């Protein structure tokens, strides 16, 4: 059995320009590496009529319970203007004790650390009292419809039991060891269209200005105090992100007015309860103004919380032991693929420092990368 190194493996993964939904061969490459350790690998390609096909990987070492799964993604965001980078984004380079390259931080390096941790564990332990698995997607940075969500459905169909999942997203704001994610807020995006009657500005009685209703609605929903937050979650928050009347003439009352907004919500609400509350406001105001509305909602995920258990506290203790920092159990930040995995297993998230994710010259500290491998190795040792 070969011995792998996290820096070398991270570099190899970064060299693949796997910009969502392009695979560029990275999933097959990782599967080959895992096969040498003893994993049975299955590359799963999913597609949708409105989206391009995406490759995913499920790999398992062992065939008994408990099954400890690591989840992550090998797709990356586009590098943007390459001229702004000090290196070629997919030519990983070490400078000033940092590994630079697109995906170094989010999240190819964490995957490399996990693979090396498993490799080391297998080399020093002839028998695993259970199974180790990986769920790696190529659709986390995109629309996320042909990725983890469908792999989870596949695992449910195959009756594959997952006892615990560690998601390797970059969870730490500033220093390695600061934060473990034990849940995430839900997210709703909405596009609201108010339908009025177009007309001449000099004859408002012959028209119905939709912007009047839109302004009233936006004012009302922005003033809503949804809740005060909970012990584990921030207060629910609504932000208006776009207002568009799309009227190029100064002497025309528009026929349509649109706005988009996002709600990040805690576990005091569901997407359905929030939509019902908002729809009542839309109906009330448009009825009074004699206008009409239509609204399209897109729910990225529901709020969820993994109640801390002995595995959570074990991982917290391991991180503290290696980093000398006791990590906070948090639910802050955006959505992640944990929102899909939590349907089949308790899960938490811990990875690198997220300062440079999606940025020009995305980078990870070499010291942090090595420490993360130690943390993952200790987690395996303590879990089994």
Curated annotation (Swiss-Prot):
The active site is at residues 75, 140. The keyword Metal-binding applies. Zn(2+) 1 binds at residues 73, 106, 169. GO terms for biological process: diaminopimelate biosynthetic process; L-arginine biosynthetic process; lysine biosynthetic process via diaminopimelate. Disulfide bonds: none annotated. Keywords: Amino-acid biosynthesis, Cobalt, Diaminopimelate biosynthesis, Hydrolase, Lysine biosynthesis, Metal-binding, Zinc. Its EC number is 3.5.1.18. Zn(2+) 2 binds at residues 106, 141, 358. HAMAP family: DapE. Catalyzes the hydrolysis of N-succinyl-L,L-diaminopimelic acid (SDAP), forming succinate and LL-2,6-diaminopimelate (DAP), an intermediate involved in the bacterial biosynthesis of lysine and meso-diaminopimelic acid, an essential component of bacterial cell walls. This is Succinyl-diaminopimelate desuccinylase. The lineage of its organism: Bacteria, Pseudomonadati, Pseudomonadota, Alphaproteobacteria, Candidatus Pelagibacterales. The gene is dapE.
